[in-house]
Amino acid sequence: MADYKNTIDFIKSVYGNKGFTPLAVPVFAGNEKAYLNECIDTTFVSSVGKFVDRFEENMAKYTGAKRAVVCVSGTNALHMSLLLAGVKKDDEVLTQALTFIATCNALSYIGAHPVFLDVDISTMGLSPDAMKEWLQKNAEVRKNSRIGELPKSQDFAFGEDEFACYNKHTGRRIKACVPMHSFGHPVRIEEIATLCKEWHIELVEDAAESIGSTYKGQHTGTFGRIGAISFNGNKTITTGGGGMMLFMDEELGAYAKHITTQAKIPHRWEFRHDHIGFNYRMPNINAALGCAQLENLDKYVASKRKVAAEYIEHFKNVDGIDFFVEPENTFSNLSLIHISEPTRQEAIS
C-alpha cells in the first residue's frame, strides 16, 4: 500500500495536480487567442482563409513532405488516403492487431477487408517479420485486374500499378498496408516500405499519434506516398478536431486538395465539378489554432520526453515492469507512455 501511495503522490507531483490527473490536456501557450481573434475579426472562419494555407505550408516544411493537405479529422485523412491509394470495395488491407477503431472505420467506409497482423514488442507497431511471413504464405503478385473497373469520376486511384498483390486463398487484391506509429513510436518503417514495394502494395502510414517523431531523421508519415496525421484534442498538438494528409508526390497532393474541396473546378461564377468530391477541408479557424500550436511543437515534445524520463527513474527499481525504450535510429514524441509486464501472463494463468 505504501508503494501505491508513493506512486500516486509521484504522479501528482509531476503534473502539479492534487486531484484527478487526466490522460491528456491541450496546452495553449502561444498565439492561439491572437490567431483565433484574427479569424473572427476578418470573418474568415470557414474553409477559406490564410491560416489553412499557412498551416499546410508550415507542416510540409516541418515534416519534409512535398505537400500537406488538411482535413476535418484524422479519420477523414485516413479515408481519403486509402481512396487515393486506390483501395476499392472488397480489397484487402494489411494493418496491425493493436490499433484504434478509426483505422478500421476508414477501411469499412470503402468496403475493404482488414487483415490484422502482429506487432513488435519493441515498437508496439506493425511487425515487418509478421508481415513478411504472412505474405509468403498467403500472397502472390500478378497483373492488376482492377484498373479501369470504375468510371473515372468515381475512381480515386492516383497512379495505379500495372501489377498487384493478391490473396491466394480469398482471391481478393491486397491493395494497401497501413502501419500505425502506436503511441507516437516509429515502427520499423523502412523494412515495411521495402516489403510494400516488393509485393506491389501501397504504403499508407497511420501517423495519427506521431507528429514530431522520426525514423533515421525522417518524419513519420513520409515513407510512402501518403501519410495521415490527427490533431484531435488528445494529440501532441491540436486544432480542436482535425487531420492532415502528407504527400511525397506534389501532383498527388494537389489532386487530394481538389477532391477534398468538392472537386470544384475554379471559375468566377460557374459551379463545375469533375469528380465525386468530399467536403473534408479544415475550417480556417481550426487551422489558425494549428498554426499557433505548431510554433510550440518541439517544446511540447521535449516536455513529454522529460515526463517520460521522470517516470522511468521512479519505476526503475519496481520489479515486473518494463518501460518502453526507443529502438536505435528512432525518435518518439512519446505521445503516450506505456509499460509492459513480462510476467503478467504467468500471473493470470
Language-model region placement:
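Conserved PLP-binding active-site segment in aminotransferase class I/II-type PLP enzymes
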Residues: M1-L84, K88, N138, N144-S145, ...
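PLP-dependent aminotransferase class I/II
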Residues: F10, F51-E57, A65-K66, D118, ...
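Glycine-/small-residue-rich active-site loops that bind phosphorylated ligands and cofactors
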Residues: F28, T99, S122-T123, G184, ...
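Substrate-binding/gating loop at the entrance of the active-site cleft, primarily
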Residues: T63-A65, C71-L83, K89, L94-P128, ...
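Structural detector of well-ordered beta-strand residues that form the stable sheet scaffold
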Residues: V69, L94, V115, E202-V204, ...
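Active-site phosphate-binding strand-loop segment of PLP-dependent enzymes
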Residues: M124-T239, M244-L246, E251
